[in-house]
Every structure is written in C-alpha cells, then in structure tokens.
Curated annotation (Swiss-Prot):
It comes from Takifugu rubripes. It holds the Pfam family DUF4519. It is a single-pass membrane protein. InterPro entries: DUF4519. The keyword Ubl conjugation does not apply. This is Single-pass membrane and coiled-coil domain-containing protein 4. The chain crosses the membrane at residues 32-52.
Length: 59
C-alpha cells in the first residue's frame, strides 16, 4: 500500500534498535567529552578567582 505524505512511517524493530543504540552512544559521549570539559572550565574559573582575590595581589 502506498504511503501517504502526511502520515509518519511506522517505526520498525530495526529503527527502534538503531534509535536505542544512538541514545546509548550519546550517553557515553556525555560521560567522556562533556563532563571533563565542564570540569576544566570550572577549575579555570576557580583558579582565576583565587588569583584575583589572594592577599598578595592586593598589596
């Protein structure tokens, strides 16, 4: 039967499996890329605040 343009295609088991795999890969990427990047940015901010407010810099 011909697929109408306005209706979405039904998701097959293969499509569902691929979608689940893509979501799992995205979760792994968050753990390996995003978290270390955020940690480095936070450490840089902490260092700059420390360097700007230490007593030796004021005098």
């Amino acid at each position: 039967m011909r697929q109408l343009k306005g209706k979405p295609k039904k998701e097959t088991s293969k499509d569902k499996r691929e979608r689940k795999q893509a979501m799992q890969d995205a979760r792994k990427q968050v753990a390996t890329v995003v978290l270390p990047t955020v940690a480095v940015v936070v450490l840089l901010i902490v260092f700059f605040v420390y360097a700007a407010t230490r007593p030796g810099a004021i005098a």
